[in-house]
Amino acid sequence: MNCKFFTIACALLSMSFCSWANENKTDSVGYQFTVTKELKTNPVKDQSRSGTCWSFSTLSFIEDDLLRQGKPAVDLSEMFIVRNDYIEKAIKYVRMHGDIAFSAGGSAYDELYIIDKYGIVPEEVYTGLNYGTDKHQHGELDAILKGYVD
């Protein structure tokens, strides 16, 4: 009986400490950020379900670097890069008899290589949305391409 009473008393005591630790502390001023330098940037884009974060992130970096250099804002086509990169990956995969990976992933170097070889176009020229969808969904495309090169 004493053991149960002691256990319950300890549990209640520890719960009271937890509620005290979570007590709302209001600060009348709060923390204020001071902006020392504000840089222009392009809006964030949605890759949706495409497995092409490498393309979106690298082109975002390039677009923002162009802004930093004082050039006008431009919206470059991520899917133009992806399309040409898939062609290059397929050629290399077949040449190596399937001994290398063939998947949706990529790297920043892929982006620079494709721009050097094929160039780059604005988003309005090549959106990559040719099938009535408003977001990129590459699950089926990835499976078809893998089946094609195998």
Regions found by a protein language model. Give the residues of each.
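Bacterial Sec-dependent N-terminal signal peptides
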Residues: 1-24
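Catalytic-core signature of thiol
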Residues: 24-150
